[in-house]
């Protein structure tokens, strides 16, 4: 039997974590460990992964086979497959690959010619031991106040009001996240963590590696975030997750754990739940056809504010309910 190689053509944290259900399924299909090829910066996501034989960067993979005839190699010596191919590109029939309209866990599987069942959609991360030496209390909340596209960024004012609420109620709060630059088709987004006042807790943004971030989330009573890479990482932990509302339909990103989307998870929607980023009727409105992705970053109803965002009142009421009922 030939060795199997899966090459993952994405770099962002969340999109890459969404590959792990496909990797796990291929492992069980072949009943052996799989070779995986990823960008160098993504290797951290697969540390300790028990389904991987050898983990290669693109450069390491090319170096390994540089003296081989490629066509002979993939026809006779190895099985080679790629996932996350050609976002926004039309296929031979003219149909655009619209990743905004597909669960990313299924994108990776679909590229290999199959679909994952609901009970196969959970993601994996296998961290190193917790190395952080910071003394943390037993009970704490983690928040991820990162910037993103405007329709996926809760305002600085809202985050500050949330921090004020948590501080007033003596809830130790840890800020996490990382400054990154994400490049997608026609969109470049700088993601960074704002600074806040009146924090009863610690700001650990840009201070933790991925394994330590996993442990930070796994040991937290509660994690609060919008749709983000850390949402997918949190989906590999046992923490309680509050996902804040945005223009993206949560059904494309909410974690599967324990066979359900509802395990230790609440989505707090805003007044508007049209989810225009993923709603294909806006493709018709913008382009006159469903065969294009609508603009991704703004409000496609042209409202003066993002009504899809959670209200601070709904968020604080939810936290109060969870704590008063000993759910977290």
Regions found by a protein language model. Name each.
Residues 1-328:
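Catalytic machinery of carbohydrate-active enzymes
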